[in-house]
Amino acid sequence: MKIKTLAIVVLSALSLSSAAALADTTTVNGGTVHFKGEVVNAACAVDAGSVDQTVQLGQVRTASLKQAGANSSAVVFNIQLNDCDTTVATKAAVAFLGTAIGPTHTDVLALQSSAAGSATNVGVQILDRTGAGLALDGATFSSETTLNNGTNTIPFQARYFATGAATPGAANADATFKVQYQ
């Protein structure tokens, strides 16, 4: 009886596995993978994590930005340089390029405007390691950082900067950067 039951179980399992083996194979489109990069002839290579990063400034109350010149707490972010060779260059500096909020605030990034819901009277200020606000012209470089062979980290800070009484809403801004080696 037990052998007969075992034989039935084994035959059932074999019939199920043969049915699975005969199932049709189906292929579907999956999507696209983008590969981005750049080959450079420079003293260092910018780390992939620094090329396209997001700095989270978080939520800041309008009460903290209620008058021109007020600012939020600064958030640290870094630009990392890899594979540096100090026989090629010993110093690096960074310049940022973006739309300034106006001619009197050339070191404050204008916010991305959306049709509705954007904050007003506020922008984003980028500070170098000395705490100096950086002009957003793409030509004014941060204070120089002395390079070491290998990996180097250049620290920056970002904060909200009020140009008047800030109103609530989305407060996002973008800037590109370039690195100068000497």
From Swiss-Prot:
**Signal peptide span per the entry?**
1-23
Any single Gene Ontology cellular-component annotation: pilus
User: Any idea where this protein resides?
Assistant: Fimbrium
Sorted alphabetically, the Gene Ontology BP terms of this entry are:
cell adhesion involved in single-species biofilm formation
| Disulphide-bonded residues | C44-C84
Q: Give the main localization category.
A: other
> Which keywords does UniProt give here?
Disulfide bond, Fimbrium, Signal
**InterPro entries from the UniProt entry:** Adhesion_dom_fimbrial, Adhesion_dom_fimbrial_sf, Adhesion_dom_sf, Bact_Fimbrial_Adh_Pro
Stated family? Belongs to the fimbrial protein family.
Q: What name goes with this protein?
A: Fimbrial subunit type 1
Native organism:
Klebsiella pneumoniae
